[in-house]
Design a protein with these regions (language model features):
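Nucleotide-activated donor-binding/catalytic signature segment of Leloir-type glycosyltransferases, i.e.
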Residues: 18, 27-50
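A charged, aromatic-enriched C-terminal amphipathic alpha-helix characteristic of glycosyltransferases
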Residues: 123-155
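Conserved acidic donor-binding segment of nucleotide-sugar-dependent glycosyltransferases
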Residues: 101-109, 117-123
Length: 156
């Protein structure tokens, strides 16, 4: 994702909220030379849930590069709070987000091209994705729905 972001023409920043070891960070620098791109910011780990929610709410978009694992909690949180979600095109992610997100693959320039595309996307179109994402969460992943499904399962 870092290399693809670096190839994009966006003037937006890429804030990476993650914990990385020094060894991994050095390897990443060697492979990508990301430190030469002032748009890339390693924020570190954010444990304060209120702060994390504010970061999400104010983010222009969210990159989700997870390939395995089913329904990913960070993807659900992003869909519920971030207007524009750019997801790696794998079955798990498509099943969760359906048409409420945009998809990229690991081909060269796939993500960079998508970043350039959304950088020029009209606000109205972004708002439509946001509405679809929030609707998807409410209709398929809300606590009320999940509890009702489990309750019906246990009763039967």
């Amino acid at each position: 994702m870092i290399s693809e972001f670096m190839k994009s023409k966006t003037n937006k920043n890429f804030a990476l909220i993650t914990n990385v070891s020094e060894k991994f960070l050095l390897e990443l620098k060697r492979k990508t030379q990301f430190e030469k791109d002032g748009r890339i910011k390693f924020v570190g780990t954010v444990y304060d849930q209120e702060l994390l929610m504010k970061i999400r709410e104010n983010a222009y978009g969210y990159f989700h590069g997870h390939e395995v694992g089913g329904t990913n909690p960070s993807l659900l949180e992003a869909l519920s709070s971030i207007d524009l979600n750019l997801l790696l095109d794998v079955g798990f992610n498509r099943e969760v987000a359906e048409d409420s997100a945009l998809y990229w693959n690991k081909d060269n320039n796939s993500l960079a091209s998508l970043i350039n595309k959304v950088d020029n996307m009209p606000e109205k179109e972004i708002a439509e994705y946001a509405l679809k994402a929030k609707k998807r969460i409410v209709e398929n992943y809300s606590w009320e729905l999940i509890c009702n499904l489990y309750e019906n399962l246990f009763i039967s």
